[in-house]
Amino acid sequence: AGARGIIPGFEEYYPYGYRPNGIYIPRFRNVNGDDGVGFTRGYGYQGGANRIGWHELIGRTPGFGAKFKNSLRTPGPWRMSLGGFGEILPYAHNTLRLHKSKKDRFGIPQATFQFEFGNNERRHREDLVEQAVAMLEAAGATDIESYSRPMVGGAAIHEMGTARMGHDPNEAVLNAHNQVHAASNLFVTDGACMSSSSCVNPSLTYMALTARAASYAVEQLQAGAIA
């Protein structure tokens, strides 16, 4: 979900190659408390700009023959796009379980998912579309188009939450050091340990958790607490 629009001017510039990143607009909703916007937590935007190419111009450019083909040599205007990424709250009813009777061809119980979005996520999408349009309007964009595709679980995520951290072994798989409560010499440091990553990319957090867990494991090994 998000919006895009035409940015007038800058026709003397053209992109060559691709940069390794686009632009990012950090979360601004509910940062210092409840903003009264009808939902908790928030969202951020990823985005970028590009000049419209011939593959899009060919369907909107009038003409025929050589004149028409020559007109496609000139790239179209710059277009700015903003795509929103919101947090999915860690609902207890969203689960991953092992099936009680069904097994795969190796005899291992099949994974069974139960997942659905809540009203909080739907409100995120409504608001982030409105705000994307407002930002593009404030930037002077024209021909603004908003979009909100159907919400599909797993379409743009980092999988997490299947072995969450917690102090109580009855409520969590891991302790605060990413160590399995029921197996002291086993550590889990990927996204399974986190029940939410806010609305940002958690990859660096995974790396930090892994470094911390490895350091703790070495300390425990040297102390003879684990083998």
Predicted regions and their residues:
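Mid-to-C-terminal "cap/lid" subdomains and adjacent gly/pro-rich loops that border
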Residues: A1-M80, G84, Q222-A227
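Internal hydrophobic alpha-helix adjacent to the cofactor/substrate pocket in enzyme cavities
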Residues: A132-T142, L209-I226
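A conserved FAD-binding loop/helix module that cradles the flavin
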Residues: S196-S215
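Generic structural motif
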Residues: P8-F10, F28-V31, F85-L89, S101-K103, ...
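Composition- and surface-driven signal marking solvent-exposed, interaction-prone regions
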Residues: R19-P20, R97, N175, V200-N201
